C-alpha cells in the first residue's frame, strides 16, 4: 500500500505535467513516471522548477535494455534512460523513465543543462548501452577503451566480447586481437542414486 505522501506527490506531478505524462506507477512506495523523449526537457524543467516538486538534484541516470525483460517477450521500445531525482527541500524522490524512439539508433535529449550532475551519468549510459544524449557537451566513452567495439551492457553483446588485448613482447606494446575463446556448451552430468531424496 502506497503512503499518502506518495499518492499526493503523484497527483501534483499529474497536474503539473498534464498530457506530457505518459504513465505513472506507484509501487513499493516509489513513484515512477514515463514521458516521451520529445517532451523530456520540458518535463525535467517542470520537475525542477515547480514549487511543489522542486527536484533540484539528479542523483543517478542509468541506461536500460528491455529487449529481454523478464520472462515474456518485450514489445515496446528497447532502450530507455532512467533518471532518479531528489528534492532535498521537500524530502521526496521520483524516478523518470524515457524511452528512445529508435531501437537501431537510440537518441534521448541530454538534461545536462538542467542538472549538471547528469553529465557523467549520461556518458556512462552512452558508453555501456549506446544511447546517444543529444546536446551533451562531451559525449565520449567513459569506462571502456577508446577503440572498444560495441556497448557491453546491451543484451545482445557476447559475454566474451569481440576482441581481447594482450602484451606482445616482440612489438613491446599492448595489441588487440580477435577473441580466441571457444564457446562451449556445458551440460551437467546427473547421477541419481536409488534412494536419492528419501
Curated annotation (Swiss-Prot):
<comment type="subunit">
    <text>NDH-1 is composed of 14 different subunits. Subunits NuoB, C, D, E, F, and G constitute the peripheral sector of the complex.</text>
</comment>
<dbReference type="Pfam" id="PF00329">
    <property type="entry name" value="Complex1_30kDa"/>
</dbReference>
<dbReference type="GO" id="GO:0048038">
    <property type="term" value="F:quinone binding"/>
</dbReference>
<keyword id="KW-0874">Quinone</keyword>
<dbReference type="GO" id="GO:0005886">
    <property type="term" value="C:plasma membrane"/>
</dbReference>
<keyword id="KW-0830">Ubiquinone</keyword>
<keyword id="KW-0813">Transport</keyword>
<protein>
    <recommendedName>
        <fullName>NADH-quinone oxidoreductase subunit C</fullName>
        <ecNumber>7.1.1.-</ecNumber>
    </recommendedName>
</protein>
<comment type="similarity">
    <text>Belongs to the complex I 30 kDa subunit family.</text>
</comment>
<dbReference type="GO" id="GO:0050136">
    <property type="term" value="F:NADH:ubiquinone reductase (non-electrogenic) activity"/>
</dbReference>
<dbReference type="GO" id="GO:0008137">
    <property type="term" value="F:NADH dehydrogenase (ubiquinone) activity"/>
</dbReference>
<dbReference type="InterPro" id="IPR037232">
    <property type="entry name" value="NADH_quin_OxRdtase_su_C/D-like"/>
</dbReference>
<comment type="function">
    <text>NDH-1 shuttles electrons from NADH, via FMN and iron-sulfur (Fe-S) centers, to quinones in the respiratory chain. The immediate electron acceptor for the enzyme in this species is believed to be ubiquinone. Couples the redox reaction to proton translocation (for every two electrons transferred, four hydrogen ions are translocated across the cytoplasmic membrane), and thus conserves the redox energy in a proton gradient.</text>
</comment>
<dbReference type="InterPro" id="IPR001268">
    <property type="entry name" value="NADH_UbQ_OxRdtase_30kDa_su"/>
</dbReference>
<dbReference type="InterPro" id="IPR020396">
    <property type="entry name" value="NADH_UbQ_OxRdtase_CS"/>
</dbReference>
<keyword id="KW-1003">Cell membrane</keyword>
<keyword id="KW-1278">Translocase</keyword>
<dbReference type="InterPro" id="IPR010218">
    <property type="entry name" value="NADH_DH_suC"/>
</dbReference>
<keyword id="KW-0520">NAD</keyword>
<keyword id="KW-0997">Cell inner membrane</keyword>
<keyword id="KW-0472">Membrane</keyword>
Amino acid at each position: 500500500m502506497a503512503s499518502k505522501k506518495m499518492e499526493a506527490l503523484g497527483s501534483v506531478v499529474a497536474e503539473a505535467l498534464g498530457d506530457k505524462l505518459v504513465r505513472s506507477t506507484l509501487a513499493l512506495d516509489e513513484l515512477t513516471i514515463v514521458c516521451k523523449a520529445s517532451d523530456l526537457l520540458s518535463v525535467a524543467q517542470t520537475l525542477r522548477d515547480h514549487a511543489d516538486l522542486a527536484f533540484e538534484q539528479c542523483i543517478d541516470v542509468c541506461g536500460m535494455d528491455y529487449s529481454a525483460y523478464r520472462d515474456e517477450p518485450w514489445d515496446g521500445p528497447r532502450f530507455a534512460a532512467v533518471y532518479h531525482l531528489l528534492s532535498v527541500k521537500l524530502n521526496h524522490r521520483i524516478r523518470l523513465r524515457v524511452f528512445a524512439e529508435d531501437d537501431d539508433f537510440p537518441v534521448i535529449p541530454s538534461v545536462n543543462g538542467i542538472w549538471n550532475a547528469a553529465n557523467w551519468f549520461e556518458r556512462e549510459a552512452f558508453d555501456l548501452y549506446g544511447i546517444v544524449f543529444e546536446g551533451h557537451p562531451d559525449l565520449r566513452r567513459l569506462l571502456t577503451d577508446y577503440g572498444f567495439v560495441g556497448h557491453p551492457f546491451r543484451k545482445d553483446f557476447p559475454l566474451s566480447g569481440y576482441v581481447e588485448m594482450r602484451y606482445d613482447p616482440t612489438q613491446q606494446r599492448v595489441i588487440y586481437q580477435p577473441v580466441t575463446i571457444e564457446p562451449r556448451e556445458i551440460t551437467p552430468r546427473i547421477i541419481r542414486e536409488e534412494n536419492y531424496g528419501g
